[in-house]
């Protein structure tokens, strides 16, 4: 076959049936003897980055690709035979069905290579596959020929032939829609009737006597178990459709042996499963529509809260149809669900109860979501971060080298979030377990924050918010002139920049989701450009992106180290308890509290009230116990 023909303008191969651990390097080592390779890409799941089991290899010359196809097809890599075919970029060629042959009733011992060797005598094969599951061959497969004439020859010769002592069916491939239309027409002319629920006191003779009144019965069978007792169902096959239809109409729902029997058209197992699945999906969708916008998810529940207490807490906001705390082994799992009678009541409950402290714990309340919805939202968030990372230009990534032979660029994620300048700066307390200089990639230079020199200004509080600017003036400067952003100052007014300087400066694109590298000059007045960040004396700036990039177990630690000194100023003796209570709140809400002293003060006072009420309750219980003694 000529790979340079009209259908295959590129020397590109599809390699399938790959082991999940196969990498680009392994494929390069395997295929490079065939000729120079331009690129190799193992396709991976966009969220988990796991291999999807296939890859594309682009050769420089079509002859090299053809040589690899002829000599390496079905070779074994990591214990699995690979399957190679030409990469067809036009989906119309793959889906047209021209030259595609379907084979069924295959012996379990026949694999892709055996099927390929058997049918290659009839013409050039584009692809060949035996369908398998976790248990092995499913007994059918497909062979896609280059021409329809070759497919016709294969069908005429092989249909009804024996392969490994089994008679196989070979025919033209039909799409599922075509098969369903054909099967639907046959279903309307059924002659086989299914009867169930007639009990154990039934045999073939008795069943024939009952159903022979509607026409000529070709066969009657009551299904038996191993002991010879009736399993309660059977089949009756009539000579024509009219007789079968009459039996169904007359006997369905009638009483036999004191039982109401079911009589209907006999169905294949896959058809019954399909109908049950459609029925289940319909019921599921109706339930989803019924509870859309009225079912609330409540988490961070105290262990002492049960169904009645949960209903009591939410009852002021509307009529509750159900309230359930999820348990395991009689112990609360810390979350539950509350269903209201209307979306308006549910919305009001979310507004009032989200973040409210109940039994020393702040609740998280939101509309309940199905697992598929949550997964889709998380995947969308991941894709947005991934797109932002890929939008960064090369100079911003320092000298970190990207692995070769990848279509999708690797995302450098430096483990260190703090860069300490060699210049003397104010001492900074390093957070434990957050940095590991040994884990940096070779030649990787940590990025410095973007700075614009502005007159410093004193702040009356230990906390401030950095406002993001919209312009940058990049200048190249030595490494020693980069400084870390440490302190409690905030950016002032936007600095004026000489237009002549702007014309000579290179322009870069910046991302708000990651920390960008910006070389700066020594003589240019620059204003710092960052996303909104919480600044604390002696600590690195905390932004939403830097918090999200940290491991989940460290996020609360980062927030707690910034919350504690602020709470300690308000209530020194209760700072530890209050900080622990507030850390149960969602991270985004905690960031807002750090940026808004009013919001923080409100939550702290609410927590103090809960602690005081709890202490008063304990004191009264102790007094009661002492009086009894």
Curated annotation (Swiss-Prot):
Pfam families to which the protein is assigned, alphabetical: MLLE, RRM_1
Entry's localization field: Cytoplasm
SUPFAM superfamilies in alphabetical order: PABC (PABP) domain (SSF63570), RNA-binding domain, RBD (SSF54928)
Record note on quaternary structure: Interacts with dazl in an RNA-independent manner. The C-terminus can self-associate and also interact with the C-terminus of pabpc1, independently of RNA. RRM 1 and RRM 2 interact with both eif4g1 and paip1, and the C-terminus also interacts with paip1. Prior to oocyte maturation, found in a complex with dazl and pum2 proteins and spdy1 mRNA; pum2 dissociates from the complex during maturation. Interacts with the translation termination factor sup35/erf3.
Record protein name field: Embryonic polyadenylate-binding protein
Organism annotation: Xenopus tropicalis
Record's keyword terms, sorted: Cytoplasm, mRNA processing, Protein biosynthesis, Repeat, RNA-binding
Cellular component aspect of the GO annotation: cytoplasm
């Amino acid at each position: 076959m000529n790979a340079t023909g009209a259908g295959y303008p590129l020397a590109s191969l599809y390699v399938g049936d790959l082991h999940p651990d196969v990498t680009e390097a392994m494929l390069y080592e395997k295929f490079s003897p065939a000729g120079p390779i331009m690129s190799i890409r193992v396709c991976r799941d966009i969220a988990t980055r796991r291999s999807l089991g296939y890859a594309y290899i682009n050769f420089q010359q079509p002859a090299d690709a053809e040589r690899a196809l002829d000599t390496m097809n079905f070779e074994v890599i990591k214990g699995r035979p690979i399957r190679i075919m030409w990469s067809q970029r036009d989906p119309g060629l793959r889906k047209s069905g021209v030259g595609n042959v379907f084979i069924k009733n295959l012996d379990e011992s026949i694999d892709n290579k055996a099927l390929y060797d058997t049918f290659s005598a009839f013409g050039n094969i584009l692809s060949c596959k035996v369908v398998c599951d976790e248990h092995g061959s499913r007994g059918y497969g497909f062979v896609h020929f280059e021409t329809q004439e070759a497919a016709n020859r294969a069908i005429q010769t092989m249909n009804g032939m024996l392969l490994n002592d089994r008679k196989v069916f070979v025919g033209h491939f039909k799409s599922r829609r075509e098969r369903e239309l054909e099967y639907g027409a046959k279903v309307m002319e059924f002659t086989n009737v299914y009867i169930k629920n007639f009990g154990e006191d039934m045999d073939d003779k008795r069943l024939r006597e009952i159903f022979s009144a509607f026409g000529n019965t070709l066969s009657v069978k009551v299904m038996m178990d191993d002991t010879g007792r009736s399993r309660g169902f059977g089949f009756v096959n009539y000579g024509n459709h009219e007789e079968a239809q009459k039996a169904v109409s007359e006997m369905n729902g009638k009483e036999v042996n004191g039982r109401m029997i079911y009589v209907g058209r006999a169905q294949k197992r896959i058809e019954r499963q399909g109908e049950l699945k459609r029925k289940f999906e319909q019921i599921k969708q109706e339930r989803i529509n019924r509870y859309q916008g009225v079912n609330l998810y409540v988490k961070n529940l105290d262990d002492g809260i049960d169904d009645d207490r949960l209903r009591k807490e939410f009852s002021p906001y509307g009529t509750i149809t159900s309230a359930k705390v999820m348990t395991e082994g009689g112990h609360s799992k810390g979350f539950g669900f509350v269903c209201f009678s209307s979306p308006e009541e549910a919305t009001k409950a979310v507004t009032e109860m989200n973040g409210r402290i109940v039994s020393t714990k702040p609740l998280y309340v939101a509309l309940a979501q199905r697992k598929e919805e949550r997964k889709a939202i998380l995947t969308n968030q991941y894709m947005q971060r991934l797109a932002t990372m890929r939008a960064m230009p090369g100079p911003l990534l320092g000298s970190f080298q990207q692995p070769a032979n990848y279509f999708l660029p690797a995302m450098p994620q430096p483990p260190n979030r703090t860069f300490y300048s060699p210049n003397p700066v104010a001492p900074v307390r390093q957070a434990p377990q957050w940095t590991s200089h040994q884990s940096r990639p070779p030649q990787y230079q940590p990025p410095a924050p973007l700075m614009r020199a502005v007159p410093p200004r004193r702040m009356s509080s230990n906390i401030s918010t950095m406002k993001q600017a919209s312009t940058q003036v990049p200048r190249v400067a030595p490494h020693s002139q980069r400084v870390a952003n440490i302190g409690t100052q905030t950016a002032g007014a936007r600095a004026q920049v000489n237009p002549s300087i702007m014309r000579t400066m290179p322009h870069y694109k910046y991302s708000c989701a990651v920390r960008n590298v910006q070389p700066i000059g020594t003589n240019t007045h620059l204003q710092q450009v960052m996303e909104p960040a919480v600044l604390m004396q002696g600590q690195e700036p905390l932004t939403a992106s830097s918090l999200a990039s940290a491991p989940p177990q460290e996020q609360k630690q980062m927030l707690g180290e910034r919350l504690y000194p602020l709470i300690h100023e308000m209530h020194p003796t209760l700072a530890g308890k209050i900080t622990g209570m507030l850390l149960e709140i969602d991270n985004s809400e905690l960031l807002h509290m750090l940026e808004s002293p009013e919001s923080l003060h409100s939550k702290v006072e609410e927590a103090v009230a809960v602690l005081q009420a709890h202490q008063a309750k304990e004191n009264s219980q102790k007094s009661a116990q002492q009086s009894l003694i």
